[in-house]
């Protein structure tokens, strides 16, 4: 009996030891989990649509392992810019911040694949995607004249009977950059001569971006000069107009990211930048959100950057004064010329 009691005691001790070992293992696991801590927070200021930026940041956050989670706080309020870690915006604002010394250098692996035209010379901001100017051509008009008759910017003046609609080029940053990019590529005199050629065909200089899209779709215009981002959200299989990006290239708005000088979230922001540039998920999201934007690395890590020769950017009108003077010249020489424009 004594041996039996001793045996039971040994078994009890083994059981207690096993239970304690399990508890220690679980506690160690919990400690490791807690050591990961709460998700790091990255504050983003953006001039783009908040829903789109939230979708982009959210998809990146979902792709991270549990112990490397990042939470993004997104704001489009200008008074919160200085508290942000990074800026996602058009290149004009990013360049202004770089010149002002507000940004720090970005050491992102995939930014090295971008040509010099798509990033700051000191790499204080990099382009993530771009928005090209396009010709939105009414399907019925295209069938009448033949689709092959309209492939280039130079083909437009030859469509003598075409009714064209476009935004007023002196209204906002996007339209002024269209004018600046076209003038930078063609030369200002040549650009003004081109716009003077098509001036008699323009039925309306629209105040709102949706107007050219609507008029080309309804047949009130044959050709709309607009942005891909303005059209893409409305595209469906039966849409009565199609997007044409001229083969030789087109004015583009560049959108990118800059890391603010005071930010301590370099590692997290750079991981996000590399993901945006290389990931097929990021490229898919540009489509599924109907943003209309195009990636600067169309094949991500497996290919080269977009052909920079077809991206017309503002390389000449760098100061605000120069940009506004160009818009004023267009307004005086082209916009106010009497060509029978609809009064709206």
Regions found by a protein language model. Give the residues of each.
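A beta-strand-loop signature enriched in Asp, Gly, Thr, and Trp
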Residues: 229-258
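Mature extracytoplasmic/periplasmic domains
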Residues: 260-318
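A bilobed periplasmic-binding-protein/Venus flytrap-type ligand-binding module shared by bacterial periplasmic
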Residues: 136-141, 253-265, 285-286
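Short, low-complexity disordered leader/linker segments with a strong preference
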Residues: 1-41
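Early extracytoplasmic/lumenal segment of secretory-pathway proteins
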Residues: 30-99
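Extracellular/periplasmic bilobal clamshell ligand-binding domains
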Residues: 300-344
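A ligand-binding cleft/hinge motif common to bilobed small-molecule-binding domains
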Residues: 92-99, 217-240
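Extracytoplasmic ligand-binding site segments that recognize negatively charged/polar headgroups
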Residues: 39, 47-48, 79-84, 90-213, ...
């Amino acid at each position: 009996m004594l041996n039996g009691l001793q045996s039971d005691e040994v078994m009890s001790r083994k059981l207690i030891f096993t239970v304690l070992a399990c508890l220690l293992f679980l506690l160690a696991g919990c400690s490791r989990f807690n050591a990961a801590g709460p998700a790091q927070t990255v504050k983003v200021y953006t001039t783009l649509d908040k829903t789109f930026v939230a979708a982009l940041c959210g998809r990146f956050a979902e792709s991270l392992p549990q112990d490397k989670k990042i939470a993004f706080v997104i704001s489009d309020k200008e008074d919160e810019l200085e508290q942000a870690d990074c800026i996602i915006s058009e290149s004009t604002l990013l360049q202004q911040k770089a010149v002002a010394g507000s940004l720090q250098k970005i050491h992102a692996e995939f930014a090295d694949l971008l040509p010099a035209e798509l990033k700051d010379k000191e790499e204080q901001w990099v382009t993530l995607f771009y928005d090209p100017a396009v010709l939105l051509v009414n399907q019925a008009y295209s069938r009448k004249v033949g689709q092959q008759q309209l492939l280039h910017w130079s083909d437009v003046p030859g469509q003598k009977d075409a009714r064209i609609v476009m935004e007023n080029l002196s209204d906002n940053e996007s339209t002024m950059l269209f004018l600046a990019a076209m003038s930078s590529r063609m030369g200002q005199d040549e650009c003004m001569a081109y716009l003077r050629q098509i001036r008699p065909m323009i039925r309306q200089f629209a105040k709102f971006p949706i107007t050219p899209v609507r008029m080309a779709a309804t047949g009130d215009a044959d050709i709309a000069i607009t942005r891909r981002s303005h059209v893409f959200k409305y595209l469906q299989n039966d849409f009565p107009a199609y997007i044409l990006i001229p083969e030789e290239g087109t004015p583009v708005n560049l959108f990118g990211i800059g890391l603010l000088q005071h930010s301590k979230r370099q590692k997290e922001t750079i991981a996000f930048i590399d993901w945006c540039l290389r990931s097929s998920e990021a490229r898919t999201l540009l489509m599924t959100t109907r943003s209309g934007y195009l990636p600067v690395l169309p094949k991500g890590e497996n290919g080269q950057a977009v052909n920079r020769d077809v991206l017309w950017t503002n390389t000449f009108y760098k100061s605000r004064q120069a940009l506004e003077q160009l818009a004023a010249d267009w307004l005086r020489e082209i916009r106010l010329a009497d060509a029978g424009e609809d009064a709206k």
